[in-house]
Swiss-Prot record:
InterPro entries: Trm112-like. Gene3D superfamilies: 2.20.25.10. This is UPF0434 protein Shewana3_2582. The lineage of its organism: Bacteria, Pseudomonadati, Pseudomonadota, Gammaproteobacteria, Alteromonadales. PANTHER family: PROTEIN PREY, MITOCHONDRIAL, ZGC:162634. Belongs to the UPF0434 family. Pfam families: Trm112p. SUPFAM superfamilies: Trm112p-like (SSF158997). GO terms for cellular component: cytosol.
Length: 59
C-alpha cells in the first residue's frame, strides 16, 4: 500500500510537533529538526518515539 502524501498536512513529529517530510526512497517520514526518521508500514506512518531512528542510522 502506498503512502498518502495528503497525510503530511495533518501528521506531526511526536517529539517536537514539527512538520515531517516524506522520503520516498527509504519509505520514511523525516523530522529534520530532531534528525529522526519514522517508518511507514503498509502505508501507515508509525509515529511512535520509540520506533524513531536517528537519521545517521536510518536506512
Amino acid at each position: 500500500m502506498a503512502f498518502d502524501k495528503k497525510l503530511l498536512d495533518i501528521v506531526a513529529c511526536p517529539v517536537c510537533k514539527g512538520k515531517l517530510e516524506y522520503d520516498k526512497t527509504t519509505q520514511q517520514l523525516i523530522c529534520k529538526a530532531d534528525k529522526l526518521a519514522y517508518p511507514i508500514t503498509d502505508g501507515i506512518p508509525v509515529l511512535l518515539e520509540n520506533r524513531a531512528v536517528p537519521l545517521n542510522e536510518a536506512v
